C-alpha cells in the first residue's frame, strides 16, 4: 500500500488515555482505544453478539467490554475472550501523525 492509503480519523487529544471513543469512517462505525498514552488501536465499533455500540463500552485492562451483555474483546487482536461473544472484531492498522490518529483501510 502507498503512503496515501493512510488517512486521519480523529485528533489524538479527543481520545482520553485508557479509554475509547467512537468515530465514523466512510460509513463504518469504529472505536479508537488509547492505552498507556502511546498505544492506540482501531477496531470495528459494533459488538459481534448483540450489535451494541462499543463506543458506549468500557476499557478493562487490555480488553473492551460490551455495554449490553458484558462480553469482552482483546484490544490488540479483536479476539472474543469472554462470553457471550464468540466472534472477534475487525482491527485496522493505525498510527499517530501530526497529532492525529490515522488508519490504513
Predicted regions: what they are:
Residues 83:
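Short glycine/proline-centered loop/turn elements that form peptide/ligand docking sites
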Residues 1-61, 75, 79, 87-105:
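N-terminal pre-ligand scaffold of iron-sulfur
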Residues 47, 66-69:
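Short cysteine clusters
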Residues 72:
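Short Gly/Pro-enriched loop/turn and capping motifs at secondary-structure junctions
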Amino acid at each position: 500500500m502507498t503512503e496515501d492509503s493512510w488517512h486521519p480519523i480523529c485528533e489524538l487529544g479527543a481520545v482520553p488515555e485508557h479509554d475509547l471513543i467512537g468515530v465514523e469512517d466512510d460509513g463504518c462505525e469504529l472505536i479508537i482505544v488509547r492505552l498507556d498514552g502511546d498505544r492506540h488501536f482501531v477496531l470495528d465499533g459494533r459488538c459481534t453478539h448483540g450489535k451494541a455500540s462499543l463506543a458506549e463500552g468500557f476499557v478493562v485492562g487490555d480488553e473492551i467490554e460490551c455495554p449490553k451483555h458484558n462480553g469482552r474483546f482483546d484490544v490488540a487482536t479483536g479476539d472474543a475472550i469472554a462470553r457471550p461473544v464468540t466472534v472477534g472484531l475487525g482491527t485496522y492498522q493505525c498510527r499517530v501523525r501530526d497529532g492525529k490518529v490515522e488508519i490504513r483501510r
